[in-house]
């Protein structure tokens, strides 16, 4: 009889290690919640908590005081519910597909109603059940993505019976440019939201996303729902990629801590001669004798092919450029600058960490941190830790 594959063996067999700091996540939530109080602060944990594991991340936010959790799909909410205590509330941002209303009500999950059709479907269920059903009502104030249009809102207000069947907990909208403080679209959306609320007196409201929590008190209303800021990304800095030096020297204005590190294992080190080609298509040609190392992660693990010949890893303070094309399961590094024998089979190199932030990797990929974060695959060994005062306590 064979022995079971232990957790230690699984971790050693993985191509890389993704370490998630639950203490930093709690800090980021508390920092935002404290700054915008008495506005309630929710946590957006859609897409498996931005790829970091909602079943571990959401309870960390709960421990920090969060009681409101937003996901995108009903299935996400149902899967997460067992990991939260009964006084937590789950909201479904995308609303409900036909035929799922009864399940949503049965589970005690609140839908965000984004169209008159969704409102009508939810009200019809309330009529069948003989009771008002709670929900959030979203308005489109300028993003043209989700929410009732102005015409739908007018029709809704005319239908007193329809409104009477729903217990509207919040009227919400979403900022399209909240991460750009100087963008005039923010003020326009705020004005539209304020005008809508004037027609729904005393109804609690929510507008601010991560960026919105840094725009000032007029954007806070009664509930804010930060997402990316909770996961260690300053929303005002994430697009500042035009000048790498300026980006690296720009000091964060907000007490947001990084929450993850990513390292990858070396699977081979070799010496190559001048003229040797590296990777698919031979896009890199050695300009002299050099030492290269192959690591066991690739674009299947969220390290996009656009990193080919321009990204990097780190070993200590030494930058190790990516050479050749990124493959599905492997990446090749120029490690000539390291003393011979420094790297060997199983050695770990840093991909995201103190020497290279998530934003830096996103910049090298010509994308945004959200895309990298949510693309980090399930092949990594995931380690959840609490880092306190320089000490580390491993939880999984």
From Swiss-Prot:
Belongs to the alanine racemase family. Keywords: Isomerase, Pyridoxal phosphate. Substrate binds at residues 145, 328. It comes from the Bacteria. Its cofactor is pyridoxal 5'-phosphate. Catalyzes the interconversion of L-alanine and D-alanine. May also act on other amino acids. This is Alanine racemase. The active site is at 46 (proton acceptor), 280 (proton acceptor). It catalyses: L-alanine = D-alanine. Its EC number is 5.1.1.1. PANTHER family: ALANINE RACEMASE, ALANINE RACEMASE, CATABOLIC-RELATED. One of its GO terms (biological process) is D-alanine biosynthetic process. Signal peptide: none annotated. One of its GO terms (cellular component) is cytosol. Pathway: Amino-acid biosynthesis; D-alanine biosynthesis; D-alanine from L-alanine: step 1/1. It comes from Brucella suis (strain ATCC 23445 / NCTC 10510). The modification N6-(pyridoxal phosphate)lysine is found at residue 46. GO terms for molecular function: alanine racemase activity; pyridoxal phosphate binding. InterPro entries: Ala_racemase, Ala_racemase/Decarboxylase_C, Ala_racemase_C, Ala_racemase_N, Ala_racemase_pyridoxalP-BS, PLP-binding_barrel. It holds the Pfam family Ala_racemase_N. NCBIfam families: alr.
